[in-house]
Amino acid sequence: METCRKAPERREALRAEAAEPRSENMAEVILKNIKKVYPNSEPKKRSKDSGEKKHNLQITDEGVVAVQEFNLDIADREFIVLVGPSGCGKSTTLRMVAGLEEISAGELYIDGKLMNDVAPKDRDIAMVFQNYALYPHMTVYENMAFSLKLKKVSKDEIDRKVREAAEILDITQYLDRKPKALSGGQRQRVAIGRAIVREPQVFLMDEPLSNLDAKLRNQMRAEIIKLRQRIDTTFIYVTHDQTEAMTLGDRIVVMKDGFIQQIGTPQQVFDTPSNLFVAGFIGTPQMNFFDARLQKAENGDYYVTVQGVDFGLAPDKQQLLRDKNAAPQDITLGVRPEHIMLCAEDASESHIKAKVDVSEMMGSSIHLHVNADGKDVVLVLATVDLPQEHRLGFRFGDTVNFAFGGNVMHLFDAEGKNMLY
């Protein structure tokens, strides 16, 4: 029983020790105008479709451009998340930092040292992959110790590091097992533990949770947050899942077609998306978009007309438009589902009529899909704020009125750029 009481205390002590600043393992990472081109594998065919290819910004005479004009300064101990759809260049960028992909142009610095031509083993980084990459014939202990053995680290030091990492990750009881005897979450912990024992300057994680089911993803996401707090070093994390990006990152980098679309804290990106793509990509359910018109009254105040209904703008948005001397123009109006409110039938304020298509009961909220003059709109309504008759949902074909305040509207110009960014 004495041992049982001491084990948790020992684990907490190790976690506290791991959380202490370790300046030798901290590193600033700088990517300057990074570009990655995959040369064409076969000669270009001068055919009728060659003109069509030029419409794809990722295909040039050099080849397929996976990443371009990538500029990012990552501070010591910062947790950066690269997020975007498949094929946006996020994993390629991570692999260039790791040295697994050659940099076509630009400069990469880690801890102030140019790394373009430095071999991966000499970059003092550790990478965790999506598929765990564990040796099936080795035990958990042997998997975690393998890189240290290659470095000729003493047996005592290897044993200390492996057991400390195992206690931090709560996998001590699995050290003698083979990977096939572990669950997906346990295997991922082993993969992370193998990276921890190396005590790298930079942790790289390439979609480490993609192979896990929803419940395990939520659990491991929390574990990664705790891990970051304990080992306190620089992280670069790649994911296509915006929930992971929002919950894990100090800052997130949204990518599309090899270009950075926006860099900011999760809240900054959510509150002020730089363009239509970011606005639609970040947030679940995604932002609603309306064809609209930005108007200017005789007194100089701006307002927005949507489906023939006028909506005023908040004072801070008015001022931003005045500062830019914005002219009346056709725009795309964006409003997040949780920022749309229902109005009474006899409401005097501006509102839009719609018919209910689908009502999804989510427990604490209802996701209401409506059709407003041919436009599909999604509302997220807190059940606690709804009248009793609507707390169990809405019926197909019900008529509802909805509106949105002047402080929650996002205005995008004809090029898709946020006019208030």
Describe every region a protein language model picked out:
Residues 83-85:
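The feature captures the beta-strand-to-loop junction immediately N-terminal to the Walker
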Residues 106-114:
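Conserved ABC transporter NBD signature motif
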Residues 70-81:
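Pre-Walker A (P-loop) beta-loop-beta motif of ABC nucleotide-binding domains
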Residues 98:
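Helix-to-loop junction immediately C-terminal to a conserved catalytic motif
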Residues 287, 296-421:
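Non-catalytic connector elements of ABC transporters
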Residues 120-281:
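ABC ATPase nucleotide-binding domains
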Residues 104-107, 157, 257, 409:
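Conserved coupling/switch loops of ABC nucleotide-binding domains, chiefly the family-specific signature
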